[in-house]
């Protein structure tokens, strides 16, 4: 009997996640109970983008000695991250507002489980140092490379910037390229104009790229953590996930209280230059909280704007996919 394409794809993504993941961490799974639930047999796969969440957790050492197993699965952008999410290959995923909405349209099992508060200055439209482009108006008739894919926070920022100057998306030629590939091409001057986000944004700016417009006044600055329904419906996994979320909240508090220490660890773990790492950490979505009504309202406005701009094919009802409080039971 032949496997269905969807099953084969899921197995392939599980293998990718396993290769990308770090070795199992947390020591031997002891018979320890969290919130009355035995989590000793649980293994969580924690998705990540460009190593940011892992760097935070390891810098603050919040996952040391947990009573369950976990491993990291790192992806270069939201598109491949949410492909793994949809396949059930990961239990937790961090992403910006619009990628979460984009993923939700293709994945009815996706749920938002936490809010992370950052800065809209963590992304922007950049050009080469010698570029004649200096304002958004100068983009008209030119090619703009957007990372990572359709439905990214950078696409939302680009469209918002164009609208400010009376331009339409059709006034530029938009091309989508994954950020690692786009970074290499921008460094080689094969890309002239790039709409991207941290850490890639912070890195190229420190290397001399000129900022045409950042996300201030356009993007929300919010990011989110999501989890699949299957994970949330598994009592032991949900208990372990609730514990991870609480620990990540503490990690964010530590990083905000020790910015220099965190920047140093972040630079070491990601191999970014210290100056770029310091910039990125200062803008990063570190403060974490349960999803509030205000967060839902902000994300709903993003969803409605993105649908009006045809970035999203239809409206997303944010309240229907948000879990205000992920408890262990």
Regions found by a protein language model. Name each.
Residues 35-165, 175, 192-195, 210-219:
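Short, glycine-/small- and polar/acidic-enriched structural segments
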Residues 89, 94-97, 104, 143, ...:
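Sec/Tat-exported extracytoplasmic proteins
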Residues 130-137, 167-168, 230-241:
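Short helix-loop capping/hinge motifs at secondary-structure junctions, enriched
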């Amino acid at each position: 009997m032949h496997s269905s394409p969807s099953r084969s794809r899921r197995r392939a993504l599980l293998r990718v996640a396993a290769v990308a993941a770090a070795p199992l961490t947390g020591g031997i799974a002891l018979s320890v109970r969290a919130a009355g639930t035995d989590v000793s047999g649980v293994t969580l796969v924690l998705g990540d983008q460009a190593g940011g969440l892992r760097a935070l957790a390891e810098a603050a050492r919040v996952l040391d000695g947990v009573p369950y197993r976990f491993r990291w699965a790192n992806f270069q952008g939201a598109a491949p991250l949410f492909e793994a999410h949809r396949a059930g290959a990961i239990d937790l995923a961090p992403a910006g507002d619009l990628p979460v909405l984009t993923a939700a349209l293709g994945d009815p099992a996706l749920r938002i489980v936490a809010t992370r508060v950052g800065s809209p200055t963590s992304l922007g439209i950049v050009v080469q140092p010698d570029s004649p482009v200096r304002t958004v108006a100068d983009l008209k008739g030119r090619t703009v490379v957007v990372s990572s894919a359709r439905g990214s926070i950078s696409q939302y920022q680009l469209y918002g910037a164009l609208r400010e100057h009376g331009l339409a998306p059709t006034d530029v030629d938009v091309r989508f390229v994954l950020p690692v590939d786009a970074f290499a091409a921008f460094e080689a001057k094969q890309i002239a104009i790039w709409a991207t986000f941290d850490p890639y944004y912070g890195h190229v700016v420190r290397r001399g790229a000129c900022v045409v417009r950042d996300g201030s006044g356009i993007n929300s600055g919010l990011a989110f953590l999501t989890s699949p329904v299957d994970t949330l419906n598994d009592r032991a996994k949900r208990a372990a996930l609730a514990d991870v979320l609480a620990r990540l909240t503490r990690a964010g508090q530590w990083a905000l209280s020790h910015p220099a220490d965190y920047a140093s660890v972040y630079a070491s773990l990601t191999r970014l230059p210290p100056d770029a790492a310091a910039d990125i950490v200062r803008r990063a979505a570190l403060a974490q909280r349960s999803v509030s009504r205000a967060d839902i309202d902000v994300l709903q406005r993003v969803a409605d704007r993105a649908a009006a701009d045809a970035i999203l094919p239809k409206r997303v009802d944010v309240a229907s996919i948000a879990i205000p409080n992920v408890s262990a039971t």
